[in-house]
Structures are given as C-alpha cells and as structure tokens.
Amino acid sequence: MPEIRRTIMNTFKDAQECQMFVMILKQKWSEFDGKLKDKFTVEIATDVADASKHTAYLTAQSVEDFKIVEDWATKEVLPLRNKFAPKSHTFTCELDARFEFGDK
C-alpha cells in the first residue's frame, strides 16, 4: 500500500504569528495518543525565505491511521489554526515514487 501524504501550507500575517502557531503545534502533537497500527510522521517546517509561512507534512502508512489522525487534528488543531486565520492550502495524495541518493 502506498504512503498517504498530506501537505498543509499556511501563510500567516507575520513571522511572529507563524512561530506562535508552530509552538502550539509542537505542544498539541506531543499530546497525541491515538492508537495507530503503523508508523505515522508529522513534520513541521518554516519557510527560510519567508518566516510567515510554514508547512506541515503528515505521512501515514495506512488509511485507517490517517483517518484517526485526521479526526483528532480536526478537533484539536484546526480550531486553534483557524483563530489565526492564515491563508491555507492542503494537498492529500498517495506516494507514487521515491528517489533517495547518497549513503546517509
């Protein structure tokens, strides 16, 4: 089964708001305790060219786990994000190919 990926790109009014939300994300995701059957990864990255933007990458090995996390995030994360009212774009896809280069 291919990996399921969700990419969420947010643009806040300024870098301070973005960093405040990143701190909230770090706290909320550390509290996640859903019972998942496979590996699930959350990565959060701030744009190096524009600190008012960040991207969250969610990677699931199973549809069931993705749904568990999606339900939790809808209740726990989205209401907090929506208070900041950033411009937001979300893409959900299945991984078609992966290329890795180098030893490490």
Task: State the predicted function of each range.
Residues A97-K104:
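Short, low-order "capping/linker" segments at domain edges
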Residues I4-T11, T55:
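Active-site-flanking beta-strand signature of metal-NTP-handling nucleotidyl enzymes
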